[in-house]
Amino acid sequence: MDKKTSRLRRALRARKKIQELGVNRLVVHRTPRHTYAQVISPENVVLAAASTAEKAVTEQLKYTGNVDAAKVVGKTVAERAIEKGVAVVAFDRSGFKYHGRVAALADAAREAGLKF
C-alpha cells in the first residue's frame, strides 16, 4: 500500500466516526502549493470555505504553501463559519498528520472562535 492510499484509508475511518456524530466538520486538505479548508454540514453541504488559492487570502501572503498561510486560511474559514451561525465543528484532518500546516490551521480556527 502506498502513502496516498494509506492517507485516504485513514481519512475514511475518521469521516465515518464524524458522520456517526452528525455534526458539522472542518475539512482540511493540503497540497505542496496550497491549503484548503471547508466547513461541511452532516448533509454534505459546504457552509463555509477558504483556501490559499483565493485572491482575498493570497493578497495577505508572500507564499501560499507554508504555516503562515495555513494560519490565515484557518482564521478566514472560522470567521466565515461563525457568520453563517456555525460555532461547533468536528476537525477532519483528511488523514494528514496533526502537525505543521494542519495544526496551524486548527489553532488559528480555534483562536478565531470555532470550537472543536
Curated annotation (Swiss-Prot):
Keywords: Ribonucleoprotein, Ribosomal protein, RNA-binding, rRNA-binding. GO terms for molecular function: 5S rRNA binding; structural constituent of ribosome. One of its GO terms (cellular component) is cytosolic large ribosomal subunit. Belongs to the universal ribosomal protein uL18 family. This is Large ribosomal subunit protein uL18. PANTHER family: 39S RIBOSOMAL PROTEIN L18, MITOCHONDRIAL, LARGE RIBOSOMAL SUBUNIT PROTEIN UL18M. This is one of the proteins that bind and probably mediate the attachment of the 5S RNA into the large ribosomal subunit, where it forms part of the central protuberance. CDD domains: Ribosomal_L18_L5e. It comes from Shewanella pealeana (strain ATCC 700345 / ANG-SQ1). Pfam families: Ribosomal_L18p (PF00861). Part of the 50S ribosomal subunit; part of the 5S rRNA/L5/L18/L25 subcomplex. Contacts the 5S and 23S rRNAs. The keyword RNA-binding applies. It comes from the Bacteria. GO terms for biological process: translation.
